[in-house]
Design a protein with these regions (language model features):
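ATP/NTP phosphate-donor binding region
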Residues: 1-35
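Structural motif
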Residues: 4, 38-39, 64
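Generic structural signal for well-ordered, non-membrane alpha-helical segments
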Residues: 14, 18, 112-119, 130, ...
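Amphipathic, well-packed alpha-helical segments that form the structural scaffold of globular domains
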Residues: 22, 138, 164-168
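Glycine/serine-rich anion-binding loops at beta->alpha junctions
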Residues: 30, 34-51
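A glycine/threonine-rich phosphate-anchoring loop and its flanking beta-alpha core
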Residues: 49-146
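Active-site segments that bind and position negatively charged phosphate/pyrophosphate groups
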Residues: 144-173
Length: 173
C-alpha cells in the first residue's frame, strides 16, 4: 500500500494532471489487479475516475468523498470530466467506483458554504425525484435550518442515504 499526494485544484484537473497520476501509479508498480483508492472532493474524483478507467485498460477504484457535494451526489454514478486547453470539463467519461465509502462525520468539519453547496445539489436531485423525495428532503433539512442549527449526525446520515437512493434510481433507469 502506498499513497500518492495530489493537489485538489482546477490546475490539476487536466490531461497533464491525469498523466502525472498515471506515471505515479506505474512507478508504484500498480498492476491490472490493483485498486486505486481516492480520498477527496470533486477534483480528486474526476482525476481518479479518468486515470483508473484508462490505466491498463481499466482498474477498479474506491472513492471516499470528503465534501458534501461529493457525499450527496457525485460519489455514485462515476461521471468525470477534466479541463483541456482551458475549456472546463471538455473531456470526460463514466467509470463508477467499485465502492464508495461515505463518512458523514467529515461533513461536520466543513465550512457552512461547503455544506450548503451539497444541500443545493441534494435538493435538485430530490426535486427531480418527485414530491415524495422532495418532502423527505424537507423533513430532514428544514427543522435544523429553521432554528439556525446544523444537521445532527443522524439527520446527515438519513439525508445522505435518502439523496443517494434517489440518485441511484436515476442512474438505473
Amino acid at each position: 500500500t502506498a499513497m500518492i499526494a495530489f493537489e485538489a485544484s482546477e490546475s490539476e484537473k487536466t490531461l497533464q494532471g491525469v498523466e502525472r497520476l498515471l506515471v505515479e501509479m506505474n512507478a508504484l508498480g500498480m498492476k491490472r489487479g490493483s485498486t486505486l483508492a481516492a480520498v477527496g472532493g470533486g477534483v480528486i474524483q474526476d482525476v481518479a475516475t479518468l486515470a483508473s478507467s484508462i490505466y491498463m485498460r481499466g482498474i477498479p477504484w474506491v472513492y471516499a468523498p470528503t465534501t458534501m457535494m461529493a457525499m450527496l451526489d457525485s460519489c455514485i454514478g462515476g461521471k468525470s470530466s477534466i479541463n483541456v486547453t482551458g475549456i472546463k470539463n471538455l473531456v470526460g467519461n463514466i467509470y463508477p467506483p467499485s465502492r464508495a465509502i461515505v463518512d458523514v462525520t467529515l461533513a461536520q468539519s466543513l465550512p457552512v458554504e461547503a455544506r450548503v453547496a451539497g444541500y443545493s445539489e441534494a435538493v435538485k436531485i430530490c426535486f427531480a425525484g418527485g414530491p415524495a423525495a422532495l418532502d423527505r428532503f424537507m423533513e430532514l433539512v428544514i427543522p435544523a435550518e429553521m432554528y439556525g442549527n446544523e444537521l445532527s449526525s443522524r439527520a446527515t446520515v438519513e439525508l445522505t442515504h435518502h439523496v443517494l437512493n434517489v440518485k441511484k434510481w436515476f442512474i438505473e433507469i
